[in-house]
Each structure stands twice: as structure tokens, then as C-alpha cells.
Amino acid sequence: ITLSELEENLVLIAQNQGHKLHCIQTNAEHEIINAIHDAKLKNNISSIVINPGAFTHTSIAIRDALSGVEIPFYEVHISDINNREDFRKFSYLSDIAKKVFSGQGLKGYELALNDAIKNNLEK
């Protein structure tokens, strides 16, 4: 499955439940931070699903951005970070995430999205 196909599937899941989904992909830390800030300031986003990749283990800046916007977020990892190298087992985000989906493959994105929708409806 390609990134575009994954995003299309997730957009359909959101639409079928009466929600909108905005997808971004970037390998640039500052662009991730800008998107997080924009989620609060410009886009009225109610939840964030994020796969921070290698920034999981390195980015205090992404942690600060997510903490600062006070939007519930769901951390997704395709592989199980706890079954990888020692340096990959630490996450700067997991302790402040609403929930972590790790090791469930691409299905983790769908699980996180559905959890975000469910929690948004329970507000």
C-alpha cells in the first residue's frame, strides 16, 4: 500500500463517521512543528494522529509543540519500538500521548483514527 492509498483509506473512514481528516507527511522537524501549531491556530483540529518516526527518540521540540497546543494526540509506530534497538525504545511523546499504537503495522493508523473519533464524540 502506498502513502497516498493509506491516506485515502483514512480520509474515507473519517468521512464515513462524519469527520474531516487533514493528512501531512514531512521529514522536516520544523514543518511538523508548524503543522502542530497550525492545527490549533488555523485549522480547528480536535485530535492529532502522529507517527513521529525517528523524532520519537530525539525531539523535545515536537513534544513541546504537542504539549503547547493542548490537542489530544495519538502516537503511531508501524513497528513495535519496544522490540527494537535500545535507543529506539524511548519516546519523548508516549507519556503525554492520549494513546500509543505501536507494532500494529499500518492498521495502527486506523486504530488511532477511530480512537480519536470515538473520544471526540464523547466530549
Regions found by a protein language model. Name each.
Residues I1-Q15:
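Short catalytic helix/loop segments, enriched in acidic residues and glycine
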Residues L10, A35-I36, I62:
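Aromatic/hydrophobic pocket-lining residues that form π-stacking "cages" and hydrophobic walls in ligand
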Residues Q17-L21, N44:
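A generic structural motif
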Residues K20-C23, N83-K123:
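Short, glycine-/small-residue-rich phosphate/pyrophosphate-handling segment
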Residues N27-E31, G53-A54, Q104:
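Short beta->alpha linker loops
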Residues N34-N43:
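Short, well-structured alpha-helical segments in soluble
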Residues N44-N82:
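Mid-chain, well-packed structural core segment of small domains
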